[in-house]
């Protein structure tokens, strides 16, 4: 088995998908999981990007189906901007498409600034822009878990195969969640699900960005990764890619294994 085949298997990627079936399966997964846990629904941060838009709409479909069957569940979509978000219009368009039961907003800027200032006061050192970006992501995780704990909701994550293979998420930030409805999907497969769901093109054709850096606002994921999502998706779907792309992805996959595992102990061997 090649490394490419191994990664495809470990990340549960299918070379091709039936969008309607994927939507049904993922909505059913959400329904079954929330019923099993006894939770009252889901909470998810909505950025206006493809991934949170898709996960949010799947969550809303799941809770509506539960209610139609006589159950009780809700979905809270939460906006978590750091000050003024440049693509706020996209976030509002995403909310209009998702149609969540509730939509709340918490601006994380004051929290992040307070910690950054205290860090500098205590250490004499200023947080790097990259490290501060991770603080933003982890602050958003704290907010979602606060809502989840208060309302009895499960926190959804938006990680998918193209992020998982590159480790392109913040550990205990956007990587902190109770369940992941997009697992196994490549970026382009996620787009096909949004098309099937009737999402506005603007939400899945826009350039993906984590938008965590103050010094490089709206920097694209592909610029930061140095690889295009088409190349990542081709690799994950079992297609032939250049040796350079294969080597880069396999190196990233190995280096970021710790992000896909629970914290290591002396009884684990995945890190050896």
Swiss-Prot record:
pH relationship of activity: Optimum pH is 8.2-8.7.
Primary enzyme class: ligase
Swiss-Prot/TrEMBL induction comment: By heat shock, salt stress, oxidative stress, glucose limitation and oxygen limitation.
Entry comment on modification after translation: Phosphorylated during sporulation.
Recorded GO CC terms: cytoplasm
Binding site for deamido-NAD(+): 33, 138, 171, 178, 224, 258-259
Keyword NAD part of the UniProt annotation: yes
Functional pathway: Cofactor biosynthesis; NAD(+) biosynthesis; NAD(+) from deamido-NAD(+) (ammonia route): step 1/1
GO terms, biological process: NAD biosynthetic process; sporulation resulting in formation of a cellular spore
Binding of ATP, residues: 45-52, 79, 85, 158, 187, 209
Temperature dependence: Optimum temperature is 40-45 degrees Celsius.
Pfam families xref list: NAD_synthase (PF02540)
A GO MF label: NAD+ synthase (glutamine-hydrolyzing) activity
Spans through the membrane: none
Enzyme Commission number: 6.3.1.5
Keyword line: ATP-binding, Ligase, Magnesium, Metal-binding, NAD, Nucleotide-binding, Phosphoprotein, Sporulation, Stress response
Binding-site positions, Mg(2+): 51, 163
Reaction catalyzed: deamido-NAD(+) + NH4(+) + ATP = AMP + diphosphate + NAD(+) + H(+)
Subunit-structure text: Homodimer.
Family assignment from sequence similarity: Belongs to the NAD synthetase family.
Function text: Catalyzes the ATP-dependent amidation of deamido-NAD to form NAD. Uses ammonia as a nitrogen source.
Name of this chain's protein: NH(3)-dependent NAD(+) synthetase
Biological source species: Bacillus subtilis (strain 168)
Gene: nadE
């Amino acid at each position: 088995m090649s490394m490419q085949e191994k990664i495809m298997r470990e990340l549960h990627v299918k070379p091709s998908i039936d969008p309607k079936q994927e939507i049904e399966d993922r909505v059913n997964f959400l329904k079954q999981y929330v019923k099993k846990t006894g939770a009252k629904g889901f909470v998810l941060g909505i950025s206006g990007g493809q991934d949170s838009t898709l996960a949010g709409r799947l969550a809303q479909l799941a809770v509506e189906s539960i209610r139609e069957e006589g159950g009780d569940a809700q979905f809270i979509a939460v906006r978590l901007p750091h000050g003024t978000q440049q693509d706020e219009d996209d976030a509002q368009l995403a909310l209009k498409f998702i149609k969540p039961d509730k939509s709340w907003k918490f601006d994380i800027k004051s929290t992040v600034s307070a910690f950054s200032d205290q860090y500098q006061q205590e250490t004499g050192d200023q947080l790097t822009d990259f490290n501060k970006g991770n603080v933003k992501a982890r602050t958003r995780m704290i907010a979602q878990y606060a809502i989840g704990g208060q309302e009895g909701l499960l926190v959804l994550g938006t990680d998918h195969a193209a992020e998982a293979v590159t480790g392109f998420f913040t550990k205990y930030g956007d990587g902190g969640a109770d369940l992941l409805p997009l697992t196994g999907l490549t970026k382009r497969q996620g787009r096909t699900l949004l098309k099937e769901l009737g999402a506005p093109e603007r939400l899945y054709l826009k350039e993906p960005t984590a938008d965590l850096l103050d010094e490089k606002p709206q920097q694209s994921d592909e610029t930061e990764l140095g690889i295009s999502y088409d190349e990542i998706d081709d690799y994950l779907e079992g297609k032939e890619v250049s040796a350079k792309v294969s080597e880069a992805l396999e190196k990233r996959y190995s280096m970021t294994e710790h992000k896909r595992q629970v914290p290591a102990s002396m009884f684990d061997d995945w890190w050896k």
